[in-house]
């Protein structure tokens, strides 16, 4: 269901995007590249200005943090590679199932009717507790 909704939204957007690209526009590719370069450079300049306000102690702390994260990720890869092929396959399948579960769970949590039913049930339970 979610896939149908996503594809229903993405395909028209992609097709209109392709159509817009195939028609003539006010900007050439060079103009767009210049605009992207200018906005990219502005972002870089803004970040450089912000980074200049950070204390050296904080920078060192962040650098140590990143080094430790790299070490942790290396250790995780080593542990994973030590697993048997069967165990690695199991973990891969488990991840697929977790991903399948997370999408419907989000849909039911955000669906207004389910929230209304949950609120009604909790109200009924509260009323029973008071009796």
UniProtKB/Swiss-Prot annotation:
Ranges where the record places region Disordered: 102-131
Signal peptide stretch: 1-17
Principal location class: membrane
Alphabetized UniProt keyword annotations: Cell membrane, Coiled coil, Lipoprotein, Membrane, Palmitate, Signal
Record's bilayer topology term: Lipid-anchor
Residues linked to a lipid group, S-diacylglycerol cysteine type: 18
Segments forming a coiled coil: 57-102
GO cellular component, one term: plasma membrane
Subcellular location: Cell membrane
Bias (Low complexity) ranges: 113-123
Protein name in the entry: Uncharacterized lipoprotein RT0080
Organism of derivation: Rickettsia typhi (strain ATCC VR-144 / Wilmington)
């Amino acid at each position: 269901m979610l896939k149908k909704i996503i594809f229903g939204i993405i395909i028209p957007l992609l097709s209109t995007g392709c159509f817009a690209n195939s028609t003539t526009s006010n900007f050439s590719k060079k103009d767009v590249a210049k605009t992207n370069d200018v906005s990219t450079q502005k972002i870089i300049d803004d970040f450089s200005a912000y980074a200049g306000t950070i204390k050296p102690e904080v920078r060192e702390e962040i650098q140590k943090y990143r080094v430790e994260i790299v070490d942790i990720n290396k250790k995780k890869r080593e542990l994973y590679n030590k697993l048997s092929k069967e165990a690695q396959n199991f973990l891969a399948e488990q991840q697929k199932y977790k991903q399948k579960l997370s999408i419907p769970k989000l849909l039911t949590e955000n669906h207004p009717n389910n929230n209304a039913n949950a609120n009604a049930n909790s109200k009924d339970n509260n009323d029973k507790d008071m009796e």
